[in-house]
């Protein structure tokens, strides 16, 4: 059984991690739960999983109120060191970095130093400090959770690094794929939050609509896989999660129905593959379309 820390347990990826712990209670034990300020979610999860520790980054949260609402004998930290303290607890094997932004950077670095496995869903950490993090981490200590980078990781598994020619990330195009410049002038935030394939948090959904997310993912891929040869293609159905081209011009791709359940569970259990609720692909009722991105 593996002890889990969930940094960002109230978010979309955090909820997938908790679902994994629910589905496989013989595989995972929640050791620490951390949120920014969503204490309602934190309290609910604490009563369900009875962790050793809970942390809240927002120093404005009332410590005494939180203590009254939580089960007894749980360590509580509110404020600056909440995330770092979460990873430095006995019984921790895996740190799921599922928060957004750079707040978890120090906690991730500490976890690497302590020799913990990192299931990394936080792209901002790598964008801001990728060289430092990857130089500190051992091989396969960081397992990416982003669907695209998980796909690349899987495609490269067992391949010598000098076989790699380039990485090809796929992009759905977001909510506004196919819109004309005039149509884009009239779009609204509500429309931007309506992603055609993925159920994600608000920030990443907006970043997907503007294609900013893909820019961050390209930087993330360069750090994770130690290459500058990273391209992307528009693939509206999000069936191919990414591809790798090798020196012999062969291409290996990872395909699955769009769901974060697979990359989350893969990162937590690497290199096992446990059952999921993800819909099987029907190869007789699908087609794969790819488009070149517009040049600006």
Where are the predicted features?
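Catalytic, metal-anchored helix/loop core of enzyme active sites in primary metabolism
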Residues: 1-296
């Amino acid at each position: 059984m593996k002890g889990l820390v969930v940094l960002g347990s109230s978010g979309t990826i955090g909820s997938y991690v908790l679902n994994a712990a629910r589905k496989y209670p013989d595989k995972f034990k929640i050791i620490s739960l951390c949120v920014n300020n969503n204490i309602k979610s934190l309290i609910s999860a604490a009563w369900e999983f009875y962790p050793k520790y809970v942390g809240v980054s927002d120093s404005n949260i009332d410590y005494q109120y939180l203590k009254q609402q939580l089960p007894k004998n749980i360590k509580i930290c509110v404020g600056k060191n909440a995330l770092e303290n979460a990873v430095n607890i006995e019984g921790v094997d895996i740190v799921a970095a599922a928060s957004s932004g750079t707040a978890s950077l120090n906690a991730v670095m500490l976890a690497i130093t302590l020799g913990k496995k990192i299931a990394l869903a936080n792209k901002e950490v790598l964008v801001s400090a990728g060289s430092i993090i990857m130089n500190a981490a051992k091989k396969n200590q960081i397992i990416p959770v982003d669907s695209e980078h998980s796909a690349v990781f899987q495609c490269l598994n067992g391949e010598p690094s000098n076989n790699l020619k380039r990485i090809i990330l796929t992009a759905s195009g977001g909510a506004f794929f196919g819109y004309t410049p005039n149509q884009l002038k009239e779009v609204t935030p509500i429309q931007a939050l309506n992603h055609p394939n993925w159920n994600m948090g608000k920030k990443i959904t907006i970043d997907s609509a503007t294609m900013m997310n893909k820019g961050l993912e390209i930087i993330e891929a360069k750090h994770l896989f130690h290459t500058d040869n990273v391209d992307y293609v528009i693939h509206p159905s999000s069936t191919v999660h990414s591809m790798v081209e090798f020196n012999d011009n062969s291409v290996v791709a990872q395909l699955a129905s769009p769901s974060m359940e697979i990359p989350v569970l893969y990162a937590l259990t690497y290199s096992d593959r446990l059952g999921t609720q993800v819909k099987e692909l029907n190869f007789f009722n699908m087609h794969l379309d790819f488009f070149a991105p517009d040049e600006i």
